[in-house]
């Protein structure tokens, strides 16, 4: 499995960390245009000072960079620079850079090591960990990819100081998700220190990141290729969220924002089907009530949407894999499971309406 390091500055002593993992000091460094501007000089200076041979690549900071055309351009640059299988790739950025960098590393010379240096809260707690790497296809997101574990995940909470508050809230959705599925004590800490974490205050921020990374890594270790259903529990709230993202044409609403809404609906569905008691439902809702959305987003992207339209998009999103929806639900706060049985559409629609009622009251 990957070695996950949470520290600041995380790039200190990078050469010794690479050598300890059998990695050569020959690194392709992938940035997007934003992370190059924010962190490029610091990262490249550290690598130069520690004796690395470096080839730098930069892609536009947008979802469209996760494409075959971008990948081919990067392959060409690496080939022309003489990059061979003795090199590794360091991905410096959020989910787009991490996915694209992982995809390039998994496919170049049939696979070179990848090191993730995530710069967003969402990437630090979710996408950089677990080895799922992919690019998009015109027919859907993340359809072309690999399981390719990073050798190292280097997490520096101080990098989050550059994030807009909206991105912090978006990343916190995944942190809260880990509490819902695996750690009720984490939920209690989040409830007590939510505003401090949003403000990036220590030690609360690092505690939340470290515990989230531990949970994700433990789940991946037990079910790397999603064979047992355990890894599927990481998708709590995501069935609803994917429908919302699809309705928005994968624009306008952040992934974490959609997951926050989806978790509210999944909590309600867990209660409707008799798995979750009312006090637990209300405790879970009290945490979700802490989230803030951009002005008008909640109304336009959820409250004004007909529940049947959302359900239709949820179904179309899953028809590529099977003929029915699969829901991750809760038996208790901190205890998730994958429901194998079909769920009556009326219950799903009811859960969507419950979530709308909840958010209207906030």
UniProtKB/Swiss-Prot annotation:
It catalyses: 7-phospho-2-dehydro-3-deoxy-D-arabino-heptonate = 3-dehydroquinate + phosphate. It comes from the Bacteria. NAD(+) binds at residues 95-99, 119-120, 132, 141. Its EC number is 4.2.3.4. It is found in: Cytoplasm. Catalyzes the conversion of 3-deoxy-D-arabino-heptulosonate 7-phosphate (DAHP) to dehydroquinate (DHQ). This is 3-dehydroquinate synthase. The gene is aroB.
């Amino acid at each position: 499995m990957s070695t996950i390091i949470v520290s600041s500055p995380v790039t200190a002593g990078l050469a010794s960390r690479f050598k300890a993992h059998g990695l050569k000091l020959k690194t392709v460094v992938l940035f997007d245009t934003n992370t190059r501007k924010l962190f490029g000089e610091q990262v490249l200076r550290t690598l130069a000072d520690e004796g690395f041979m470096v080839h730098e690549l930069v892609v536009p900071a947008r979802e469209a960079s996760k494409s075959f055309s971008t990948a081919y351009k990067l392959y060409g640059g690496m080939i022309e620079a003489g990059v061979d299988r003795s090199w590794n790739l360091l991905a410096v950025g959020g989910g787009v850079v991490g996915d694209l960098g992982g995809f390039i590393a998994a496919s170049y010379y049939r696979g070179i090591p990848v090191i993730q240096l995530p710069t967003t809260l969402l990437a630090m707690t979710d996408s950089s960990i677990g080895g799922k790497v992919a690019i998009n296809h015109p027919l859907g997101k993340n359809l072309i990819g690999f399981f390719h574990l990073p050798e190292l995940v280097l997490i520096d909470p101080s990098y989050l100081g550059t994030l807009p508050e909206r991105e912090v809230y978006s990343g916190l959705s995944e942190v809260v998700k880990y509490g819902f599925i695996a750690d009720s004590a984490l939920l209690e800490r989040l409830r007590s220190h939510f505003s401090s974490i949003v403000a990036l205050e220590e030690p609360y921020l690092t505690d939340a990141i470290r515990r989230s990374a531990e949970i994700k890594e433990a789940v991946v270790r037990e079910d790397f290729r999603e064979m047992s259903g355990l890894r599927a529990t990481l998708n709590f709230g995501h069935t609803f969220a994917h429908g919302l993202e699809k309705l928005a044409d994968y624009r306008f609403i952040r992934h974490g924002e959609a997951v926050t809404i989806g978790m509210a609906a999944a909590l309600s569905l867990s209660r409707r089907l008799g798995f979750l008691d009312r006090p637990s439902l209300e405790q879970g809702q009290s945490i979700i009530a802490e989230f803030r959305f951009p002005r008008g987003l909640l109304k336009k992207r959820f409250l004004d949407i007909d529940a049947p339209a959302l359900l239709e998009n949820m179904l179309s999103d899953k028809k590529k894999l099977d003929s029915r929806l699969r829901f991750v639900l809760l038996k208790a706060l901190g205890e998730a499971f994958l429901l194998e049985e079909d769920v009556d559409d009326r219950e799903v629609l009811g859960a969507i309406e419950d979530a709308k009622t909840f958010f209207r009251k906030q």
